[in-house]
Amino acid sequence: DDTVPGVDIIYPDPGFIIDKKEDLLGIVLTHAHEDHIGAIAHVWPKLKCKIYATPFTSVLITEKFKEKKIDITGYLKIVELNSTINLDPFKIEFVTLTHSILEPNGLRIQTPAGNVLHTGDWKCDPDPLIGGNINSERLKEIGNEGVLAMICDSTNVFSSGRAGSVSYTHLRAHETGPY
């Protein structure tokens, strides 16, 4: 980042979470992009809670902790795609989405008050370059069951129209230069 020369990583102040760590049931990751996992090896030693992630995300998380020589044996829990974990009083279902990385997930969080859908980063890409396609049938079922709230990440919320497929972008990049 050119605005902060010499700084390798910036992350929000974790003080609020650290103050409530006795109530923390775990860290649940939606996918392995750096803006979602980059601070984990810096913050986790102050929390020492379980980390839930899909296989691909788990590999990248493990490498981050190895780089910092932090042992997370017993804390990293690998979650299979389209499965559910129980963090009482919550049930958290991983729902496959599409994005520009392997194994992106939305999370249906069943709470005593109702269902919350956290999308993580996503894109409705009919022709994804990597990974499987969005589990649209499951998302419809979740919608039909009722959603109390939806928490949604969006990089291009102020852009009108539909974003192009990653496959199309990849094809255009190969047409314009030697990659």
Role assignments for model-derived ranges:
Residues 1-28, 33-172:
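His/Asp/Glu-rich metal-coordinating catalytic cores
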